[in-house]
Amino acid sequence: MEYALHEVLEVQEMTAFKTLCLTKSKTMKALVSDPKLKEIMQQDVDITTRQLQEFASILSNAKQE
């Protein structure tokens, strides 16, 4: 599937934002002492990591076309 330039730029912006969120979650998780909150933050890290992998795949396919 061919992507328009504005679509690629949107994915790049989302990737930058999610990367920042991932960094923040990983950093804050180290400072949290509550186990339940730590578990929620770990889930966020896992989900965000998967999303970033999907974005990378989309961007890789967009560059090949």
Curated annotation (Swiss-Prot):
Matching InterPro entries: Spore_coat_CotF-like (IPR012851)
Record-given protein name: Uncharacterized protein YraE
Species of the source: Bacillus subtilis (strain 168)
Gene from which the chain derives: yraE
